[in-house]
């Protein structure tokens, strides 16, 4: 076939699937050849010929009767004494002719790789330069610092930090407001602008700026009532600012109904604060500068951090300095003004938050493998400051916050650090609701996203993680439904994490989603908006795009090799099976370039396993399966003369492949591993024989019997052993069983495969006469149970298995190569994806098609 464009080839394939995969043929052979032809109701020996008109219907000449029959593409009338089933799967979407048309400049040109290498160096420099944190200026906080007074030599007051006042004077935006010009949030602009106007008015300067700022505030105050959500502690801080503005004679509409409502709300909070004066962190620290009139300044000093700040907040610290004259407060603020050039950020230091956020960002973008050492250094730093109380933005933070703590829990656990989920209990009230930090009764949306992602990594019986999940999932789903935030990037992230939690998130799919929604001008919100330049970073995004496309180009070359092998081996002509080369390749979930040999071996073996599964389920008789299995046990191709030719061909292709891959294993491991490799294959085919015996006898096993057999026949054992031996790490004989069958983690992943598969395939299998499934076996054991009861039970079993598998994966094991362990563990991902909605292997032309296109076919625009 001549080379077509990719889209043309895909279109032709879609139109031609039925004809190419005629279910009446086992293997399509040349005219005049003798062959077995297998229909869904039987098998016969035929000679291939065509009518005199040239291309047209196939005429099959029976060697036993001499009769002929024209077979249409839907015919299934060839009958003998051996009944056959047909699953009627759709054809291969990504067959040889489609994949071979793929072209990409990212493989041939060295320019892209050279630029990627340059970016890696620059981002490593960024890691190495991490200190106490890099963060954008805050007009709100700088204005508070500008308001601090000192006594001059003549006894009059003057600004103690004139550089801060100068910054406020020089940084008004064109619309009269202060803030981050590219991002408008009403609460943010009102806080920044009102306090800036106050600072200028206190020192009777910047009259033009005050006039413009006042006009902006007056126009926008009326819009507050339309806001769906106010920024954290806005109802405490903003009314206090308005009181100060009114005292200074700034002309604003103070009698607006919503402003009165805010003032009433604040008064109620002040009453609560006064009643709980001994519990200062729980009620004051997050909005300290909004509580001046009820503050006991002597008591508050015991909550000062080592660096002199209060909750790392320049605004709160400036307020304390104004009321106490504390020198440590002065030193903290003065150091910030020097560091940031006359202004201050909304919080400092942020050394823990910045390191965790940078690592999380890098890994989400799919480029973490370039920075393994830098990530380790960053996380070692965070772990040194980890506390069972949780952590805050910086190492000296006295009050932990949920966002940093949950992010720390997730990131540290992902990298094998010993951290307890009990730390989350510090952010939960008696009703099971979580809050952002001590003293707050609300929770920020971003904190809930991080909490949800942390709960993904739950181990068995971790109550704190279960509580986090119960709280976070409905909260996020409700946020999506009600659109309580206008932050597009955050909403896209919420959509992804809710739809594809950790046990369902293929790394390349996650990277593609994150890259597509990445905003290199992203802002976060505390009291006001802020940026972290290490995260709002175009270099990270550029590298992620280049890296994705470069790796994708390698994957395309591998897919070309694999589809070519599938075709040249003759397996593409076997028509009782699903042809799923690209789907099996996707299932490995291992994308790194150095694991090319692993992916190729896994895909070749996995494709044959799909074929064997269909052969056992819908084609072979029990005697044929036994003969096939005997050939596997004896490692002998001469025992197969009694089975159909197509089964003989499948055996020979498999036999040759295993021998070839074993030769590659010998080169990596330095010894012959065939004895290890044969064991899981024998177990695998023995289970198929057992299943067929049960089927032919009409026996439905108990749930326990079912799992012992069917969790093996799902096939992870034979399709993973050789691939992990090709990962470049030496695997000792005694370690094989620790990472592979019968290790706990391996059995748990296999269990999740088997049962998740059952929830989406049992009805089709039942229609074919295959009664045994996890659902049927559970119902047999539990009389009166419905299919719905069985599926709920199976989902609970799978959930438990995934938690236990996580525990086994993160459990320290110095003798087990981490790459091998990760390969086995990551196989849990694809089954959750493939069987999320439907049987994704049987019906791969819907959701799975889109995954494959995004990961392997469509490059990212650079």
Swiss-Prot record:
Residues holding Mg(2+) 1: 613, 617
Record Gene3D superfamilies: 1.50.10.160, Farnesyl Diphosphate Synthase, Terpene synthase, N-terminal domain
Record text on cofactor binding: Binds 3 Mg(2+) ions per subunit.
Known cofactor(s): Mg(2+)
Catalytic activity annotation: (2E,6E,10E)-geranylgeranyl diphosphate = taxa-4(5),11(12)-diene + diphosphate
Keyword Metal-binding: yes
InterPro entries noted in UniProt: Isoprenoid_synthase_dom_sf, Terpene_cyclase-like_1_C, Terpene_cyclase_plant_C1, Terpene_synth_N, Terpene_synth_N_sf, Terpene_synthase-like, Terpene_synthase_metal-bd, Terpenoid_cyclase/PrenylTrfase
EC code: 4.2.3.17
GO biological process: paclitaxel biosynthetic process
Pathway: Alkaloid biosynthesis; taxol biosynthesis; taxa-4(20),11-dien-5alpha-ol from geranylgeranyl diphosphate: step 1/2
Keywords for the protein's UniProt record, in alphabetical order: Lyase, Magnesium, Metal-binding, Taxol biosynthesis
Residues given in the record as Mg(2+) 3 binding sites: 757, 761, 765
Record keyword Transcription present: no
Motif (DDXXD motif): 613-617
Record text about domains: The Asp-Asp-Xaa-Xaa-Asp/Glu (DDXXD/E) motif is important for the catalytic activity, presumably through binding to Mg(2+).
UniProt function note: Catalyzes the cyclization of the ubiquitous isoprenoid intermediate geranylgeranyl diphosphate to taxa-4,11-diene, the parent olefin with a taxane skeleton.
Name of the protein described by the UniProt record: Taxadiene synthase
Protein species of origin: Taxus chinensis
Gene it is expressed from: TDC1
